[in-house]
Amino acid sequence: MIPRVKICCISSVEEANLAINYGASALGLVGNMPSGPGVIGDELIMKIARIVPPSVSTFMLTSETSANEIIQHHKRTLTSTIQIVDKINESSYVLIKNEQFELYL
């Protein structure tokens, strides 16, 4: 088995391209957080996500805790994956899973 590697805290298109060129399988793009490194704005997250080839996953790390906030955050960034970094209630998982996401690429 060959492990897949996610590089987190990507902060620019240049860093994203560098990680991709070195073989990253996924990129972590950190949204607004109460603390910690690597936070970038939603517009930059979307800009980076749009240049990444389909073979590389993009993770939007969100500290939002309600289903609606998480869904709205994703709609502002359009990454291929949502990474929830805080505790949310079980019903939120169901709402997020059932959301019909549309990608406008």
Predicted regions and their residues:
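Conserved N-terminal beta1-alpha1 strand-loop-helix module at the mouth
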Residues: 1-91, 95-105
